[in-house]
Structures are given as C-alpha cells and as structure tokens.
Design a protein with these regions (language model features):
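Short, ordered loop/turn segments at secondary-structure junctions
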Residues: 1, 7-9, 101, 124-128, ...
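A structured phosphate/pyrophosphate-recognition subdomain
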Residues: 2-44, 48-57, 61-65, 125-126, ...
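Acidic, two-metal ion nucleic-acid-processing modules in DNA metabolism proteins
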Residues: 50, 57, 65, 208-247, ...
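Flexible, glycine/threonine-enriched loop-and-boundary segments that flank and lead into catalytic domains
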Residues: 304-331
Length: 535
C-alpha cells in the first residue's frame, strides 16, 4: 500500500490542503476500490466523429479509472491507411469500449474502408440501464450535461464526456457511493471544518457532499448531538457545525477524554448515544468555563509580551494555562491583538506544549521551521499549528521567536478592519429569496467567507438587548419596505442609544441566515457593522 501525503512538496498530489480526515477516507476508498474487478484492468474508450471532410478518431486509455494515455488522429478518407496512423499500436491488446457501436463502425468504415475491422464493445446499453437519462442520447449532447466537466476549467470534447460518464457509471455499478459513504463523508465534513482547512478544491466538494448527506439523514451519534444542540429538523449549515458541533466534539479531547466522541459515533442504540451526547455537551460546557478562567491568565501575559516581540507576535505561557485550551486561547489572542499568537502550557512531566494561530495572513511556517530542532514534535498548517518541547528549552525558543518576530513582515493591520462588501442590495431585493442565493455559495468557512451584503437607509423599528449570563447582544428589527428583518448584532448591546436608537435610519453590512424555532425557519440578518444615517 502506498500512502500519499499531499503536503509533501514532491507528492505529486494536485491539492496540498486536503484535510487529514479526507486523506484517511480516500485511503479507505482506495482499498475498497482495489477489491473491485476493474482494479488494474486496462480499458480503452474510443470515439470517431466527422470533422469537415475528415474524421477525428480519439482514444483514451484508463487504468483504475485514471487516464494514462490518449491520442487523436485526423483522417481524410483515402489519404492514409490505418497502418500509417498511431491507432494500431495504441489499440493493440486493448479492451475497446464505444458509445453506439453501429454509428462508430460506420464512421470508422468511412475513414478507413470496410476492410478494417474493429473489435469493440458497445457500453451504451449498460450505462443507460444505470443512468436512464443517457439512453438514446449522443455524446455531443451528453458532454454538455457532465457535472464533472464543470470543474475542468475549459470546454470538454465528446471523448471527455464519454470518459466522465463511464467513470460515473462504474462507480455507481460497483456501489462506491451509498449509505455507508454518505455517513463517512459526514465525518469528513466535520473533521475538515474542525481542522480549519481552507474550503477550496477537494475540501469544498467533500464538505458539500457531507453536508448534503447530513441534512438528508444525519449519521447515528451526530443525530443525537444535533438534537441536543437544538439543530434537529433544521437545515444545518457549516456555520451551525462550526459554532455548535465541532467545538463540542473537540472539547472531549481538550478535556482529556477524546474517546467519548468516538464512542458517541460508534455506539449501538439511541439510549447510549443519547447519554454520550449529553456527556459531550457537558464536557463542552466545562471547556467553556476553563477557557474563561484561562483567558484571565492569558490575556494580560499576551498583552505584556507585545513589546518584547516587536508588536508582531503575542506570547503567553505558564503552568496555570490548561493544555486543552491552548489552541482556543491562541486563536482568541490573535483575534484580540491582530498579530500571530503563541500560547504555551507548562506540563507536570517537564514538557511544554504550545499552540500557534495566525493573523493577517501570516504563514506560521516562518516561525515553526527555524525552531524545529528544539521541538519534540510539531505540526499543523500555515494558519494553525502546535508543538511540544522540553521545558528547559523554552527560554531558547522564546529568544528565537523574539528574533524571528523582529524580522517578520505582516500585512498592514488596518486592512484587517476593512469590511469587504460582496453586494449592495436595494430594499426590494431584501426578501427571503436572498437566502437561496446565499445557499448557492455554501459551504462557507476558512477561505470562503459568508457573503457580506450592504443596505442603506433601513429604519430601526424595534430593539431588544439579549443574552443569558451577560446581556451583551442586540436584536434589531429593520424595516426594509415589504419585509421587516430581525437583525442580530453580537457583542454590541452598548451601542444602542449611543450610536443609534429606535426610529433612526441606518446603513448596515450583514450576512443572511435562518433562525430555526419550533420547526419554523425565520430569515434574519447577522450584522457586521451599523452606521446611523445623518440628517
């Protein structure tokens, strides 16, 4: 078995940022594929088509459904024999599959005469049995219906459409996408979001498929956790998962009992799963309290460290910082001070364990790699990483980080404060239908922020302060003409009656979301910023 690590520079894999959980799932899928009859079987797809007064004969060789070689020959009838083309050595010994054999034989006879015989198999009937929409259609028509082709970046030909259709057919025929894979991809989606991997390329496709499967039928264990978090029956988004599900799962590891999350997804029967879901949520509550306690330690340490690290890095370390929340603390420090952050826990066994988080697009490799010889272990990616080392080497690490920070080049910090607006909407566009537009750009997450809209002159017709323990949040009702929108403004309750009040007209930047309550979904805005309209 050869295991490809996409992050290795010479791996040959086309997408470096594939999430670790996706690498594991693809390995499992590859091992399953190796058990199929098609494994290692050479297959050749051939297509002949007229082109002006000539014929174009194209063929592609596949091994394990991956293209390994292709040729294209343009033949003017009567000008060359088949032996003068590259077709004979290319096709020799191949299992040749065609679409609509009768038509293909006619085209080949016109190109080379009736003295040339091609032994080929018409796969069209087999494919139409599994994909009825393909029955009776030409490759010219089918190529434009290929979903795979949407990711090609350029228009595809008939042979490419044939190839995509054949791959889809074989995968369906062999049951490589079914309930089992739907459940597995839900875990891949959760892992990709939890690991803060960029939602581009394969990550985006895998998360989208996992999210769709989750909304159709959440897997055992996840269903109970969704219910416990008030998400049962709701159309779940990546935002819901990132805020309410992955933190709860991660909390089991942060609190030293990662096996609880594993048991939740493996348990038989609703009763043990319900009990485990309750325990996972409880552990997440404990983690939140631990985070609040740790922040009281971390924040002043990080603030005091800024001068030492040239105002380009914030560092906090100490025995009072719990190992399970170093990542959360580093993320919070980076957000608070707008610089990369390092938070380190001093362990009882004489080691120091740290987490790094990026800010302003800074790649953490520039901090990690020059210190690699100090670490017992380290890993992660450009924007989130971790390490461990012997505690006696901590001073040496801090000295190196001090030098590295002095030379670090961070993008202008002011850019962080700018809001990028995707579209300004007139009031007549502010209908619930705007949610359907936003849905098309899912999945949102790292590398694919939610669409941010702006609207001007909306009247505040109601305002309420919200919050359980601390009433820090604001709920406004904005009059947009035909519709009045509920609008949530997190952590901004203090701005009511200071920057704006009921009756004022405001300009606002926001994204749109659904608030599910008692089985009903209510459109709402999540405000990013609000500015009172003067005059």
């Amino acid at each position: 078995v050869a295991i490809v690590n996409p992050k290795m520079p010479d791996s040959g894999y086309p997408f470096r940022d594939l999430a670790g959980c996706a690498v594991v799932w693809k390995l499992i899928s590859a091992l399953r594929f190796a058990c199929l009859d098609v494994y290692k079987q050479p297959i050749c797809l051939l297509n002949a088509r007229p082109s002006n007064e000539a014929y174009v004969i194209e063929a592609v060789k596949l091994v394990n459904l991956v293209e390994v070689e292709r040729i294209s020959e343009t033949v003017v009838p009567g000008m060359v024999s088949i032996s003068q083309t590259r077709l004979v050595p290319f096709l020799q010994g191949q299992q040749i599959l065609v679409w609509d054999a009768a038509t293909q034989v006619r085209q080949l006879e016109k190109a080379f005469g009736k003295g040339v015989e091609f032994n080929c198999y018409d796969i069209a009937t087999d494919i139409a049995r599994d994909i009825p929409a393909a029955r009776g259609a030409s490759l010219l028509k089918l190529k434009d219906q290929s979903k795979i082709a949407r990711y090609n970046g350029k228009p595809i030909g008939e042979l490419d459409g044939f190839l995509n259709l054949f791959v889809t057919f074989l995968l369906r025929k062999n049951g490589t996408w079914g309930p089992r894979e739907a459940e597995e991809l839900q875990l891949v989606a959760l892992g990709t979001l939890a690991d803060l991997m960029p939602l581009r390329g394969e990550n985006r496709i895998l998360v989208r498929r996992g999210l769709a499967a989750m909304n159709e039928r959440p897997r055992p264990g996840l269903a109970e956790l969704l219910s416990r978090q008030g998400l049962a029956g709701k159309r779940v988004t990546t935002g819901d998962l990132s805020w309410q599900i992955t933190p709860a799962i991660n909390a089991t590891g942060r609190m030293g009992t990662p096996e609880r999350a594993v048991e939740l997804f493996l348990a038989d029967g609703p009763v043990p799963r319900q009990r485990l879901a309750e325990e996972v949520v409880r552990l997440n509550g404990d983690r939140k309290q631990l985070g609040a306690d740790s922040w009281a330690i971390v924040e002043p340490l990080a603030r005091a460290s800024l001068p030492r690290f040239s105002e380009r890095l914030a560092v906090a370390y100490g025995a009072g910082i719990h190992r399970g929340v170093t990542g959360i603390m580093a993320n919070r420090v980076a957000s608070a001070f707008k610089v990369p952050a390092v938070v380190i826990c001093l362990m009882e066994d004489g080691t120091a364990v740290g987490s790094l988080r990026s800010a302003r697009g800074f790649h953490l490799d520039a901090l990690l790699e020059p210190c690699a010889d100090l670490f017992i272990d380290h890993g992660g990616h450009a924007f989130a990483a971790g390490f461990s080392l012997r505690a006696e080497r901590l001073d040496e690490l801090l000295a190196r980080l001090e030098r590295l920070a002095a030379d670090a080049r961070l993008p202008d910090g002011d850019a962080e404060e700018e809001l990028e607006i995707d579209a300004e909407l007139p009031h007549e566009y502010l209908t619930p239908a705007i949610l359907d537009l936003a849905d098309r750009f899912e999945p949102y997450g790292e590398g694919n922020d939610q669409l941010t809209f702006a609207a001007r002159g909306m009247k505040i017709v109601a305002a309420d302060i919200m919050g359980k323990a601390e009433r820090n949040h604001l709920k406004l009702t904005l009059d947009c003409g035909k519709y009045k929108w509920p609008a949530i403004f997190w952590q901004e309750a203090a701005r009511l009656n200071r920057d704006f009040a009921v009756g004022d007209r405001v300009d606002a930047a926001f994204h749109v979301a659904r608030n599910a309550f008692n089985g009903t979904e209510i459109p709402q805005m999540i405000l990013e910023d609000v500015r009172k309209v003067e005059g």
